[in-house]
Swiss-Prot record:
Belongs to the pyrroline-5-carboxylate reductase family. This is Pyrroline-5-carboxylate reductase. It holds the Pfam family F420_oxidored. InterPro entries: 6-PGluconate_DH-like_C_sf, NAD(P)-bd_dom_sf, P5C_Rdtase_cat_N, P5CR-like_CS, P5CR_dimer, Pyrroline-COOH_reductase. It catalyses: L-proline + NADP(+) = (S)-1-pyrroline-5-carboxylate + NADPH + 2 H(+); L-proline + NAD(+) = (S)-1-pyrroline-5-carboxylate + NADH + 2 H(+). GO terms for biological process: L-proline biosynthetic process. Gene3D superfamilies: NAD(P)-binding Rossmann-like Domain (3.40.50.720), ProC C-terminal domain-like (1.10.3730.10). It is found in: Cytoplasm. GO terms for cellular component: cytoplasm. It comes from Synechocystis sp. (strain ATCC 27184 / PCC 6803 / Kazusa). Its EC number is 1.5.1.2. PANTHER family: PYRROLINE-5-CARBOXYLATE REDUCTASE (PTHR11645), PYRROLINE-5-CARBOXYLATE REDUCTASE 3 (PTHR11645:SF0). GO terms for molecular function: pyrroline-5-carboxylate reductase activity. The lineage of its organism: Bacteria, Bacillati, Cyanobacteriota, Cyanophyceae, Synechococcales. PROSITE patterns: P5CR.
Length: 267
C-alpha cells in the first residue's frame, strides 16, 4: 500500500491527529509515515500506531501525497532546509501557529499549501480547525485537508487574513473556557460544595449548554433568557456578571489574542 500521508514532527498535536486519523479509518497505519528526529519518540509512535517512521524528513516528503508540517515554528527554517530539493510535490499542510502561507511557500515553491489552525480539544477529537488555502490548491486537495481535520473535530475554511481572528476565538478560546469552568467551580466551593462535586457540576454545565445551543441552533441570548425568570436566582447572578464586565472582558481577551497573533506573525 502506498504512502498517502507524511507527518513531519511527532509531538502532541501530531500524535493526536495521527491517532484520530487511524481510529476514524481516514488512513490505514501503513499509509502513514512520520518524520521524527528523536529515536525514543520514533519507537513509541511505531509501536503504538504501527506506522512507518524515519529520522529523515526528506524520505517522508518524497513518498507522501500529503505532507503535514507539525513542528515548532522556531525550527521551521531548519526543517524547510531539510526538505529542499525533493522531486515529489505533495500537498503541504502546516499547523504551525502564526506562520503564514507566504513563509511556507518559500520552502515549497509552486506547491499547493494549506495553513491550518487546530485547537487543543483536537487531542480528544473535539477540536475546531480553521484552514486557509493558497491559489495552487485544487478542490480534491482541499477535500483531503478537510477530511484530515474532520477526524479531530469540526472544520471551517476562512481567508488567510482572518487566521489571527481565529486564533483569538478558537485558538485561545479553550483557555478562556477552562478559566470560566475553574471560576464556576470555585464559586461552588465558596458556597459550600466539595471541590470534586463543584467541578463536575461546572464542567457538565458548560458541556451541556454548548450542546444545547448546538442542537437547538438558538442564539445564546435565547438560552440565557429561558433560564432567567423574573426576580429569580439566575438574573441575580447575570446582573453581577454584567456589573463586573464579564462580557466585555471576554471580548477584550479575544481582541488581545488577535493582536498578539498579528504581532507574532510579523516576526
Amino acid at each position: 500500500m502506498s504512502i498517502q500521508l507524511g507527518i513531519i514532527g511527532g509531538g502532541v498535536m501530531a500524535e493526536a491527529i495521527l491517532a484520530r486519523l487511524i481510529a476514524e479509518k481516514t488512513y490505514a497505519p501503513e499509509e502513514i509515515i512520520v518524520g521524527e528526529p528523536h529515536g525514543a519518540r520514533r519507537d513509541y509512535l511505531q509501536k503504538t500506531y504501527q506506522v512507518r517512521v524515519s529520522p529523515d524528513n526528506q524520505e517522508a516528503a518524497n513518498v507522501s501525497e500529503v505532507l503535514l508540517l507539525a513542528v515548532k515554528p522556531q525550527v521551521l527554517d531548519r526543517v524547510l532546509a531539510s526538505l529542499a530539493g525533493g522531486a515529489n510535490r505533495p500537498l503541504v499542510i502546516s499547523i504551525l501557529a502564526g506562520v503564514s502561507l507566504q513563509r511556507i511557500q518559500k520552502g515549497f515553491p509552486d506547491h499547493a499549501i494549506i495553513r491550518a489552525m487546530p485547537n487543543t480539544p483536537a487531542t480528544v477529537g473535539a477540536g475546531m480547525t480553521a484552514i486557509a488555502a493558497n491559489k495552487m490548491v485544487e478542490p480534491d486537495q482541499l477535500a483531503k485537508a478537510k477530511a484530515i481535520f474532520s477526524a479531530v473535530g469540526n472544520v471551517v475554511e476562512v481567508p488567510e487574513n482572518l487566521m489571527d481572528a481565529v486564533t483569538g476565538v478558537s485558538g485561545s478560546g479553550p483557555a478562556y473556557v477552562a478559566l470560566m469552568i475553574e471560576a464556576l467551580a470555585d464559586g461552588g466551593v465558596l458556597a459550600g460544595l466539595p471541590r470534586a462535586i463543584a467541578q463536575k457540576l461546572a464542567l457538565q454545565t458548560v458541556l451541556g449548554t454548548a450542546e444545547l445551543i448546538k442542537e437547538t441552533e438558538e442564539h445564546p441570548a435565547q438560552i440565557k433568557d429561558k433560564v432567567t425568570s423574573p426576580g429569580g436566582t439566575t438574573i441575580a447572578g447575570v446582573a453581577v456578571l454584567e456589573k463586573m464586565g464579564f462580557r466585555s472582558a471576554i471580548i477584550e481577551a479575544v481582541r488581545a489574542a488577535y493582536r498578539r497573533s498579528q504581532e507574532l506573525g510579523k516576526k
